């Protein structure tokens, strides 16, 4: 009986006859030979159908079969050094499973809006396939890393009655007779978890009602948010760089084929596995921008062009330390020797990709935190549970948040966050 395999396992069956369930992505013919481009969800490779070596019925089917038709193919695996994948199948038999009508995403060029309108089908193509495989590896490596480091996974609520950074960018919903919001961060709940379990991380969707159309913004995206008790900011930075380097190394180790499909320079990625990452102060970053004739003054937040320029100046990710208090959230701990900045940092990815992590040591003093909440104009009653964490055995603790799609965009070397998530949600897109 012929063995049934996946395309990805072809390397283990060279010169063997196998059977594979596939979809047709493209084809061409030279008259006596048909070349079928095939996929099965694990990889892409080529099927070669030689007229003199198959029945007339099989060769005619190879000529007539339509793009995205599904079929069983039987044949012998051979090496193919010309392809990214490295193997092909010499087809001896084809059994049609499901015919396809006129498939809308043809091999020709299509505009991005057309492709996003057909995202449910575009996912089948090589580029999104490679990106989603790398996304999956980053998710797998995230769980592995934090498990190895002694963290517990904790699931914060998606519906919340309070907002960690104010309510200006929150999606409001009616919650029976009350107001509620879709979460924009699991951090406050992760802090509660850290006081119970020591080291926790959250990993889930968050929502930002930002009316932005830039390549770096989505309204729905995924965040990894670790929180660590008895840990100061410098120690947190070490965890952050170790985690990012771990993600990059695992993508290199497990997604070489997908990186080749994206033409991503693996040697470039290897540089990002070397730690520690460089660190500069916010003050120094402003000086660098001013020296490059950027219109910025101390106290301004960095925009995308600023972060792009700064990250371009380093061959590795770089930490920007100690931002002004006026441009960061209320829960951060002030610097011990400066009242105007926080013990915080953003990690900027190189190659112009900008911020992928934001983090800080958290304020532990009850009175100071209460005063900060009031100064923000937030309802203090909504935060009594959060203040309880300072009432009962407060300890130094730190945390950070990594935007999954931003990390994917950088590691894959792509231009826009919309390609880093299966079904992107943006200001002008909520379908399919």
Swiss-Prot record:
UniProt keyword annotations, A-Z: Aminoacyl-tRNA synthetase, ATP-binding, Cytoplasm, Ligase, Nucleotide-binding, Protein biosynthesis
Keyword Transmembrane helix among UniProt keywords: no
InterPro entries (alphabetical): Aa-tRNA-synt_II (IPR004364), aa-tRNA-synth_II (IPR006195), aa-tRNA-synth_II/BPL/LPL (IPR045864), Asn-tRNA-ligase (IPR004522), Asp/Asn-tRNA-synth_IIb (IPR002312), NA-bd_OB-fold (IPR012340), NA-bd_OB_tRNA (IPR004365)
PROSITE patterns, A to Z: AA_TRNA_LIGASE_II
Subcellular location: Cytoplasm
EC number: 6.1.1.22
Domain of life: Bacteria
Annotated Gene Ontology cellular component terms: cytoplasm
CDD domains referenced in this protein's UniProt entry, alphabetically: AsnRS_cyto_like_N (cd04323), AsxRS_core (cd00776)
One Pfam match: tRNA-synt_2
UniProt keyword annotation of ATP-binding present: yes
Gene Ontology molecular function, alphabetical: asparagine-tRNA ligase activity; ATP binding; catalytic activity, acting on a protein; nucleic acid binding; transferase activity
GO biological process: asparaginyl-tRNA aminoacylation
Complex and partners: Homodimer.
NCBIfam families listed in its UniProt record: asnS (TIGR00457), PRK03932.1 (NF003037)
Annotated family: Belongs to the class-II aminoacyl-tRNA synthetase family.
Stated name of the protein: Asparagine--tRNA ligase
Gene coding for it: asnS
